[in-house]
Amino acid sequence: METIVRDAINSDKFSVLSFCKDTFSWGDYIQNVWDYWLSEGNLLVIEKQYPVGVCHAFFSKNQVWIEGIRINSNFRRQGFASDLVRHIELLAQEKQILSSFMLIDTENLPSLSMAKSLNYHIFQTWNFYSLSPQINNSHKIQFGNVLNSTATHYVKSWRWLVLDEETLLSLSVQNKIIFSGKFDDVSTAIITDSEHFDKTLIVTLFSGSQNNTLDLVSYIQNYSAENNYKKIQILTKEKLPFLHTLEHKITFTLMQKFLR
């Protein structure tokens, strides 16, 4: 039976969500973002009489971000995930986009193997931490852009987006870039609101010295508590110091492919 890749429609939602329930130990997030992704466009399904796989693409500044690849467990190992990725790559090439990125759990060996078979390589490794909001006044941070060229991306709603001069200026004007430089190497963070989950703060952290990082963490906790955030999600390439309010959740590989 022929399979086709097409744009998702709202009536696909029930059948798609039926195989997006137990992806992670805690469940899945597709049900929470389906409506957003559908309205954004580039939400794709692969069907064999009915949808057996789904994937979303987000195009921005000469890159495509591939997210939410899910395949019905009864149809895995048939190349459907690869078909979805290739379809998105073709869309990107039509837009003359040069790079494709996706994020994969370091322990998800089948997905890593699939990505490598499509000529993706490991670009960076990132750690995800959750932090509890709490009133904490033991901090002294500053606002402003002190990032160097090694900071290539920041995280916005779990998409790794390019940090170019225009973006840095916009974030700086909005006071979204904070730093602490009291002790040795400067630590810097970019704070943004999740576009898909209420009262969730997403932090991209570039950690310098441990004391500077702890200074930023204290500020972020206090800022979140004062502004009634429920969750703080920190993404960083570094290992963070131990705190009882800070929990390491998962480590990801950021995969990249240059599109010709």
Explain the meaning of each model-derived region.
Residues I69-R77, V203-N212:
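A short, internal acetyl-CoA/4′-phosphopantetheine-binding micro-motif in the GNAT/acyltransferase core
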Residues S82, T106-Q124, E238-I250:
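Conserved active-site alpha-helix within GNAT-family acetyltransferase domains
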Residues F59, L103-I104, H121-I135, E247-R260:
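Conserved catalytic-core motifs of GNAT/GCN5-like acyltransferases
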Residues A92-E107, N227-T236:
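Conserved GNAT acetyl-CoA-binding A-motif
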Residues K21, G27-L44, G53-I69, I190-D198:
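A conserved beta-strand-loop-helix scaffold within acyl/acetyltransferase catalytic domains
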Residues L118-F197:
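Amide-forming acyltransferase catalytic core, primarily the GNAT-like/NAT-type
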Residues F75, G79-H87, N212-Y219:
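Conserved acetyl-CoA pyrophosphate-binding loop and the N-cap/start of the following alpha-helix
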Residues M1-N10, P133-V146, R260:
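Conserved N-terminal entry element of GNAT/NAT acetyltransferase domains
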